[in-house]
Amino acid sequence: MDKIIKTKKLESYEETIYKIFEFTNLYYTDVIFLDCKTPREVFEIVKNLNYKPDPKGIEFLSRPLYSIFEKDLPRDCDDKTLIITCYAKLKGIPYKIAVTGKNKYPHHVFPILCLNNSWVIFDATYEYSEMGKFIFAPVFFKIFEEKDLLKFNQ
């Protein structure tokens, strides 16, 4: 199994979102061991993974298997989002990715899953995160679906 970790300067939040969608399609089987878990159980598992921010000015995005099992790697909102989007893809659960910010600038990502015909906030970034709730009142808020990011494929 390849250990793929993207490390680069931040270009844009759209590029980060694109990479989450790309890695979801490439590595969703990394979370096959979660197949028997309910969405709520997966939320709790991901929430309880220690948060570790990326180094300043560098964006790390690790494949889920490494985010889950290697404690020395950065594990921030985009890494936790990727674990959950991989689970959603594995289970056939529709998902989107939200980008938020406490002011007019984006700085946080999290998944939104369609459960029982309702879109549910699935932000498991921090230990105090609660399924279905924002971790802060966003000023900046934008939702992406994979089809929104086709320009990065050209």
Question: What residues fall within each predicted segment?
Answer:
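A structural boundary/capping signal
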Residues: 1-154
